[in-house]
Amino acid sequence: MTEFKETELDERAIKMAKVLSADAVEKAGSGHPGSPISLAPVAYTLYQHFIKHDPNDPNWEGRDRFILSGGHASLTQYVQLYFSGYGVTLDDLKNFRGGAATRTPGHPEYGLTPGIEMTTGPLGQGFASAIGFAYGERFQRGLLDPETPKEDSPFYHKIWAICGEGDIEEGISGEAASLAANQKLGNLTVIFDANRIQIEGDTNLVLAEDVLKRFQAYGWYTDEFSFIQPDGSYKEDIEGLADVIAKAEKAAPDQPKLIKVHSLIAWPTPGKTNDPSSHGSKLGTEAVAGLKEALGYDPEENFHVDEEALAHARKVAERGLEAHKEWDEKFDAWRKANPDKAALYDRLKAGELPEGFDKALDDLEATFEVGKGVATRGASGSVLNAIAAVMPELWGGSADLGGSNKTDLKGAATFAPAECATKQWPNCNEFGRQLHFGVREFTMGCITNGILLGSHTRPFGGTFFMFSDYERSAVRLAALMEIPNLYIWSHDSVAVGEDGPTHQPVEHLASFRAIPQLEVIRPADAFETAEAYRYFFEKKNTLPGAMVLTRQSVPVLAETAAKAKDGVKKGAYVLVDTEGTPDVILMASGSEVQWAVAAAKTLAGEGVKARVVSVPSMEWFEEQDAEYKEAVLPAAVKARVSVEAGVAMPWYKYLGSYGKPVSIEQFGLQGDGAQNMIDLGITAEHVVEAAKASIAEVEAAK
């Protein structure tokens, strides 16, 4: 049992939350009113009595984290932020969904509204990312305070989330939940709002299984509570709900927890309660008036604030301030006792790289041999291990492809309870830095997003480039949130070979380059790979990056040995040049740079002056000023060729009217990887032919 006793002021605050939610959607003319109305008592109970937070300092290190996975119900959270004193105002509620300047968008957006921990909306991602938050808490605590019992550590906190049937129906929640149980994430509690309604009607049509039994099978602690009484009446008993939550917290310290709350959507709105129409549309003037009458409000008054109830709810800020002061004492004692760890914490919080980062890369590059064949995935693995030696905050793994992606950190313990140990991975402990996601690419993307949002550490996750499609929605969300997640995608072309076209990416470079604020990086060789990592970690903007890497060996180029350090960070740079103005520019990325270099030599032998431009990252190149772009790709040189083992779509902005792509505009082939490249025209000979054709067209147009 909890010490919490519901008062009349609590009841009045919950009623006010319902009315404000209805008014906000009505004024906006669109939105999702039903869930915020029926979730009001749940959210109020969490914010007032369970979530440890300080509205005076939304970014307080010691706070619990709350994620509203069903982001369409955003007013559920906005109203509680208003009640708690986060700086969300009544005017903000009135401006719900109100355009680019609003602080209360239709779905919560990270970095826009104080108290919002992540952007949610695509269902299931908040649920899965909440698991990432729990990963991040545990690893960071192990990094900074491993010896202290977790409840006594200033770095221990809990993760709270609310989800609905839509989240549960999305496959991502199931695959992530399975992994969460395996990890024994006892600081994660998810409230499952089971109102049995979605846009197309009663969920019995599509969700027939016993969800709690499914989660029990995963290894979760489960319980349930119902506002619907046995006699059919409805009672929002928040004392009873609080007791169930408190019981779960005590009973399952080492299990993630799912608490199913049976509710009626939009209760007590006349004509809209338990009706699908209340899910995603405004209620209408008559229904809103009926809701207000049912709750004792004037149906003619909009956005009425019960000042006494609001003042009561705002007392949570006083409790938060007191909790913050207690935490400060604990944190200060930790800092005094652990000066080295405190220095590490300060560096991580500031986002600074460690001493020795550049030297680790320089020393590695000194081992590269010009002319030697090295797959860029192999170079990537060498880089990760080199910088991991000086970056304790770097951790990650793969979706069951670590040996292929080269994402294994040599000698690192596995992040998993000791009982998860296997013959292949005998060293498991809760603070390990080697991650294993199983065959769960989407979960991997969501978890690493959550790690970034919930800690000061730097995760990475790897898979085959072909399977990045499974991860795409999480990648897009990272780009939208502008967080520096690191995706490592190997086996990047038809050179994958005998696995055939199901495993040979063709359209993927174009499709990921189409995502705004995602930096796609495809290095040509070992030197470019090392420099790509250097710049990704050194740059101060906070965008996600995708390292797209070869399966096959590619030669370490003499030209990159001399120029990559200054060139890669520019996104595109002159790798091979000529005397005077070139006759043609050959642009290439990744494994095809070697063919552009070879073609330039052939053309030179025929008296054609060809400049080779390596383009490891179009996004980084687009960040450069006009003067630099003109120096690399002078407008006067209209004969151009692009060379990339994928569709040519992204290259046309550089090719101009007379340029010729050497590309792959079909699915791959079953067969040897090198032969596939030849059969599909990715050769130096084809580059030479394309260069001559482009030059001829330019001449003909004169």
Residue positions per predicted region:
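Thiamine diphosphate
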Residues: 1-159, 315-546, 550-555, 632, ...
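General structural signal for secondary-structure boundaries
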Residues: 6, 87-92, 207, 229, ...
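Terminal amphipathic helices with adjacent charged low-complexity linkers/tails
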Residues: 61-62, 263-269, 273-355, 619
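Walker B beta-strand of ABC/ABC-like P-loop ATPase nucleotide-binding domains
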Residues: 162
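Residue(s) in the substrate-gating loop at a strand-loop-helix junction
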Residues: 165
